[in-house]
């Protein structure tokens, strides 16, 4: 059968040379990277401690988290939190007005039973009984006395996981924190002459203004944010706060350091970012009532604007990440309105905008440090898209809005059709806004986010204003330009080729002859015969097959096999990665576990549709593992793929891996599977629809989910090439014998060919629907 190609790829897709895997890991790893480049660093990574950056105006901006500072004695200013970060137990801070208030804070490690300890507090040895019964949290205790030689009392305590504490002078009181993280709260002690209270810190500390008290509370409860700098973080003396800072202009170039061949230049720039979204709307074949996909795609935009009297030409590329897939299914009839998938960006999504302009700042964006940006927010509101149905009122997808807020900046490379541009990538987090979006004339209403249908709402572009600053290592000779790191546009060219190839593949669906397709689906296609129609295949057969298998290893089908084998402990102990598809077929425990899981689901989920859908998602693997004589969906999928490869004028060895992988995932998305028990047939689709009926009369009977799960474990699973509705329609209009019904239920290819050769319109229409579902 033609589906042999998929089974062959599943079996062999994990056979990858170690060197290839090491190279792949090295080229794709993008997380948990530690950077310590030092001066004149040659690195493509930017610092990721995203602060407000350099503020290039006349406004003085107070830092949110100032420090860390070394232990010392000083008189902290009023209305400033002193955030203490101790590392060892003991006295961490003392404060007194030398009149009637002596306050100290002690840190006690976890799991300490009640015991006497000696502490030196204000220069006096004090005996205190302390305890901390928590197994994992540290305990801060305030000890207070009202005279220099008086007795000490213990007061409000704080149980803390982050091991942070804070003190502030405000409104004639000393404020501290109490309670238990992550729900710690502020408390206070009244004191006279509070503004003259001197504090002695015995650990590193930070300064936070009272205006940012909410952030201070967040740090107390959850810990300090991760910090990554180009150099080690070393606590400074508090006198460092008195250093005079020279303010920079909004647009200027500053020489930081210079040698004979290299110099460090600081570039400060105002920036105007204009961008737009792009989308793809794909309509399914058939009568015109169904849409297969509405999705975002990257959008390039070129424009000019004036900066300090100079005209600047800029180029942006807007892309999205973390999209949410929505769908609407109005029914299974050919005239029912269906949108299989439309993408929406929400608060869990990100928008990336790559920016480049022709100014001096971007001539040598190769070796960069101290990269920072300060950008405004922007609101993006969706428009309306009319689903033009052949008959009836048109549904309209309308509304939706999100706001974009700056969340970081790093280096990137934009690929255009002619040149690569070293640029800055601005990352934006999203917040959903009013209005909501809805699909009119349906029950899809009051949903939030920005759909891909009309994200620009008729606007030519969205605009964001802001500033950025960076220090770049550049040649001392201004006439020399450092080479761009990625000077070729291989991936961009490949994406363009794939886009054109997908359009060609989808158009070729109309040219496939069904009788030839059935014959081709019966052939045992392997990798060589599948790709034999491609030019240069024989010369590059080995490398191309390896590339196909490496790409296929990441496909949804391969991941389904891995997930199944990993999740079933009984089967996983005896299944190796290389033979997973064979082992699943012979491992009864793997499919018995499906039945067990369905029993568990039925106790918590009352919907039969949900349960059958859960089983059906694994039936493709079950069917492939227990191959029968009947034809299956993967046979048709592989046959259509082979036919389109042979007919295509744009296919090449470079695009084959992506096309084969996409075909395995996207061809025939609406599948149904059946199991036969004597004269009873149980049929379920991955969309949750299910039927149970008699073979001879096609009369529906109650659907027993548990029995269906048990049959899946013990019986062959068959692709419902001719589904129940088509069979019933065929029987009602033409009448079929019980033997013909059995043959069609088993997807017997000979019987299918007979009906097609007889030009039976019902069977031909069903096969045409399956072919039209073979889209990329």
UniProtKB/Swiss-Prot annotation:
Instruction: Indicate which residues form the motif DGE motif.
Output: 308-310
Ranges where the record places region Spike body and stalk (antigen domain): 248-479
Keywords per UniProt: Capsid protein, Coiled coil, Disulfide bond, Hemagglutinin, Host cell membrane, Host cytoplasm, Host cytoskeleton, Host endoplasmic reticulum, Host membrane, Host-virus interaction, Membrane, Outer capsid protein, Viral attachment to host cell, Viral penetration into host cytoplasm, Viral penetration via permeabilization of host membrane, Virion, Virus entry into host cell
**Which residues are listed under the site Binding to sialic acid?**
101, 190
Indicate what this protein is called per its UniProt record: Outer capsid protein VP4
- The residue stretches assigned to a coiled coil in this entry are 484-511
Give site residues, Cleavage: 231-232, 241-242, 247-248
Disulphide connectivity of cysteines: 203-216, 318-380
Region: Spike head, residue numbers: 65-224
What family is this protein classified in?
Answer: Belongs to the rotavirus VP4 family.
- Gene Ontology terms: cellular component: host cell endoplasmic reticulum-Golgi intermediate compartment; host cell plasma membrane; host cell rough endoplasmic reticulum; host cytoskeleton; membrane; viral outer capsid
Q: Which domain of life is it from?
A: Viruses
Q: Does the keyword Transmembrane apply?
A: no
Q: Where is this region: Spike foot?
A: 510-776
The record's listing under InterPro entries reads: ConA-like_dom_sf, Rota_A_VP4, Rota_VP4_MID, Rota_VP4_MID_sf, VP4_concanavalin-like, VP4_helical
Something else known = In group A rotaviruses, VP4 defines the P serotype.
Q: Where is this region: Hydrophobic?
A: 389-409
Q: What is one process in the GO biological process aspect for this record? A: virion attachment to host cell
């Amino acid at each position: 059968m033609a589906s042999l190609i998929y089974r062959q790829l599943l079996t062999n897709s994990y056979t990858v040379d170690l060197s290839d895997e090491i190279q792949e890991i090295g080229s794709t790893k993008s997380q948990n990277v530690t950077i310590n480049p030092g001066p004149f660093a040659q690195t493509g990574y930017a610092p990721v401690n995203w602060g407000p950056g350099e503020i290039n105006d006349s406004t003085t901006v107070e830092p949110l988290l100032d420090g860390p500072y070394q232990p010392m004695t000083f008189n902290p200013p009023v209305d400033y939190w002193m955030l203490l970060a101790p590392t060892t137990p003991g006295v961490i801070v003392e404060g007194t007005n030398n009149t009637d208030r002596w306050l100290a804070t002690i840190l006690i490690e976890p799991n300490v039973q009640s015991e006497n300890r000696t502490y030196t507090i204000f220069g006096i040895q004090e005996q205190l009984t302390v305890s901390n019964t928590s197994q994992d949290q540290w305990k801060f205790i305030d000890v207070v006395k009202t005279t220099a030689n008086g007795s000490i009392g213990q007061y409000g305590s704080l149980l803390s996981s982050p091991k942070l504490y804070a003190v502030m002078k405000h409104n004639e009181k000393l404020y501290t924190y109490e309670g238990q993280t992550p729900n710690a709260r502020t408390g206070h002690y009244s004191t006279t002459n509070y503004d003259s209270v001197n504090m002695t810190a015995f650990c590193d500390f930070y300064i936070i203004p009272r205006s940012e008290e909410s952030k201070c509370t967040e740090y107390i409860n959850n810990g300090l944010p991760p910090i990554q700098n180009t150099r080690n973080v070393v606590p400074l003396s508090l006198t460092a706060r008195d250093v005079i800072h020279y303010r920079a202009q909004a647009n200027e170039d500053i020489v930081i350091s210079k040698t004979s061949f290299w110099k460090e230049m600081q570039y400060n720039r105002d920036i105007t970012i204009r961008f737009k979204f792009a989308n793809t709307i794909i309509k399914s074949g058939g009568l015109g009532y169904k849409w297969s996909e509405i999705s975002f795609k990257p959008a390039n935009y070129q424009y000019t604007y004036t900066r300090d009297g100079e005209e600047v030409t800029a180029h942006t590329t807007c892309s999205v990440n973390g999209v949410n897939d929505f769908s609407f299914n109005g029914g299974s009839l050919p005239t029912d309105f269906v949108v299989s998938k439309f993408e929406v960006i929400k608060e869990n999504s990100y928008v990336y905008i790559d920016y480049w302009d022709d100014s001096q700042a971007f001539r040598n964006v190769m070796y960069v440090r101290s990269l920072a940006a300060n950008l405004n927010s922007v609101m993006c509101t969706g428009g309306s898209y009319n689903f033009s149905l052949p008959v009836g009122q048109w549904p309209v997808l309308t509304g939706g809005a999100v706001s974009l807020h700056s969340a970081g900046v790093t280096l990137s490379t934009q690929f255009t059709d002619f040149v690569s541009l070293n640029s800055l990538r601005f990352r934006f987090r999203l917040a959903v806004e009013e209005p909501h979006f809805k699909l009119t004339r349906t029950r899809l209403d009051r949903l939030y986010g920005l759909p891909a249908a009309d994200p620009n709402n008729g606007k030519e572009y969205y605009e964001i204003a802001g500033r950025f600053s960076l220090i770049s290592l550049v040649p001392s000779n201004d006439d020399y330009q450092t080479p761009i790191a990625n000077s070729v546009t291989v991936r961009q060219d490949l994406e363009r080729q794939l886009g054109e190839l997908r359009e060609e593949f989808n158009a070729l669906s109309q040219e496939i002859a069904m009788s030839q397709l059935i014959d081709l689906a019966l052939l045992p296609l392997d990798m060589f015969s599948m790709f034999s129609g491609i030019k240069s295949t024989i010369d590059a057969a080995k490398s191309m097959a390896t590339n196909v298998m490496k790409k296929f290893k990441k496909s949804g089908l391969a991941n389904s096999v891995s997930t199944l084998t990993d999740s079933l402990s009984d089967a996983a102990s005896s299944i190796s990665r290389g033979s997973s598809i064979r082992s699943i077929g012979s491992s009864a425990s793997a499919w018995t576990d499906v039945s067990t899981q369905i029993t568990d689901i039925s106790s918590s989920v009352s919907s039969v549709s949900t349960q059958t859908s859960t089983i059906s998602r694994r039936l493709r693997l079950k069917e492939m593992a227990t191959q029968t004589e009947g034809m299956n969906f993967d046979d048709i999928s592989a046959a259509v793929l082979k036919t389109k490869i042979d007919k295509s004028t744009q296919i090449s060895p470079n695009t084959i891996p992506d096309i084969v992988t996409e075909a395995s995932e996207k061809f025939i998305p609406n599948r149904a599977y059946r199991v036969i028990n004597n004269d009873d047939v149980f049929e379920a689709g991955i969309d949750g629809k299910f039927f149970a009926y008699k073979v001879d009369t096609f009369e529906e009977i109650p659907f027993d989910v548990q029995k269906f799960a048990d049959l899946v474990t013990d019986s062959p699973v068959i692709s419902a090439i001719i589904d129940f509705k088509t069979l019933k329609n065929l029987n009602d209009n033409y009448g079929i014998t019980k033997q013909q019904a059995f043959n069609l239920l088993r997807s017997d290819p000979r019987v299918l060919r007979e009906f097609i050769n007889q030009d039976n319109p019902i069977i031909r229409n069903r096969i045409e629907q399956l072919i039209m579902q073979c889209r990329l």
